[in-house]
């Protein structure tokens, strides 16, 4: 009888690999870890196989997938042409990596990303997954201006082990975001041209149920020049007539700040976040006029209109409400209260 662990000594008969359940007589969901090469090299436990597009994994090979890329990320890079190379198959696996070099037509530059991570999965407990790794991205954020973002991270993911059908997920994430901007000709934003680093902690509790959606998170950021704390709560309900009602509450405050007066890059934004951590998919992040400057991203203040006082360097609170009338036609209303240094709190609204 085999207990939790037992060692076996296998005679060395010049075998090149050892296989458990070779004839698959014992039912198993995941057979990938039944193979062990006798070469002792964990990176080449199986021969490499190259495939276009994601496919069902082979038990006999380590597979690399090639996916051609034709995409549009922003107006500065324009059309991106390249290749995504990764080892992510249909089933989860511990070690994952991906690299995506692309040529950006408008910026005439090589951009893209690279990511490597390691996953540990747990059964029959609320902590279901721990993953850590590093990601690097390089792209344009303005004309003739590039940003390199380096992020080592670790995530702890939770779910109800007694109800695996539940859509509720929780996560605690830690990351250290390094931003380095490369200005070729841009002369604005000089104050933030030097590299900066931000340590970010975020706890998320989300239920992605289609009918009763809710999500809240608590976020803390720390750097040499500032510390911030913010809270976001959002609920969405669907009626029997297929109408949606959405309510969102946001509050954020600086814990400390050494940011020079007049510098708004790290302030709380009422309607259009500055995105100094480059987390949002702006089509034209550096635009101040035109259609791309009006791109709507619901974050921070979440306002839909541009107001005279759009930033807060002390604290900001807001309430956003919206309801669908017909398909994608909605009505909305926003109210907020913000505070800047040396000024009284300001009440703002739009609809």
State what each model feature region is.
Residues 149-171:
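A charged, amphipathic interaction segment
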Residues 111-114, 143-149, 167, 182-190, ...:
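Outer-membrane beta-barrel translocator domains and adjoining extracellular loop/strand segments
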Residues 131-144, 155, 198-324:
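C-terminal outer-membrane beta-barrel translocator/porin domains of Gram-negative envelope proteins
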Residues 17-19, 65-67, 96-98, 129-135, ...:
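Residue-level detector of the transmembrane beta-barrel scaffold of outer-membrane proteins
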Residues 70-76, 87-89, 101-107, 118-120, ...:
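Transmembrane beta-strands of outer-membrane beta-barrel pores
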Residues 2, 8-10, 21-124, 160-166, ...:
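Outer-membrane beta-barrel initiation region
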Residues 331-341, 346-350:
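Active/binding-pocket-proximal capping segment
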Residues 12-16:
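Noncatalytic modules at the cell exterior or secretory-pathway interfaces
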């Amino acid at each position: 009888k085999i207990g939790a662990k037992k060692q076996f000594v296998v005679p060395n008969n010049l075998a090149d690999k050892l296989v458990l359940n070779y004839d698959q007589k014992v039912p198993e969901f995941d057979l990938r870890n039944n193979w062990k090469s006798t070469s002792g090299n964990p990176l080449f436990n199986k021969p490499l196989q190259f495939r276009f597009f994601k496919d069902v994994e082979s038990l006999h090979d380590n597979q690399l997938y090639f996916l051609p890329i034709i995409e549009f990320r922003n107006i500065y890079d324009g059309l991106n042409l390249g290749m995504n190379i990764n080892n992510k198959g249909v089933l989860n696996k511990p070690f994952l990596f991906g690299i995506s070099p692309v040529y950006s037509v408008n910026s005439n530059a090589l951009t893209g990303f690279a990511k490597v991570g390691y996953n540990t999965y747990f059964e029959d407990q609320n902590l279901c997954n721990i993953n850590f790794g590093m990601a690097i991205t390089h792209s344009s954020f303005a004309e003739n201006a590039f940003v390199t973002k380096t992020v080592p991270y670790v995530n702890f993911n939770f779910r109800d082990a007694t109800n695996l059908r539940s859509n509720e997920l929780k996560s605690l994430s830690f990351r250290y975001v390094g931003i380095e901007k490369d200005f070729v000709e841009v002369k604005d934003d000089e104050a933030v041209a030097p590299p900066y680093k931000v340590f970010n902690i975020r706890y998320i509790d989300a239920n992605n149920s289609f009918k009763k959606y809710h999500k809240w998170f608590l976020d803390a950021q720390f750097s040499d020049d500032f510390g911030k704390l913010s809270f976001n709560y959002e609920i969405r309900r669907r009626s029997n007539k297929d109408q949606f009602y959405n309510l969102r509450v946001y509050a954020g405050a600086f814990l400390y700040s050494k940011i020079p007066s007049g510098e708004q890059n790290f302030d709380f934004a009422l309607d259009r976040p500055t995105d100094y951590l480059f987390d949002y998919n702006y089509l034209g992040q550096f635009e101040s006029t035109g259609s791309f400057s009006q791109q709507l991203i619901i974050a921070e203040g979440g306002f839909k209109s541009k107001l005279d006082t759009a930033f807060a360097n002390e604290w900001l609170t807001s309430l956003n409400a919206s309801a669908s009338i017909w398909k994608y036609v909605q009505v909305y209303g926003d109210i907020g209260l913000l505070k800047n240094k040396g000024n009284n709190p300001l009440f703002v609204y739009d609809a």
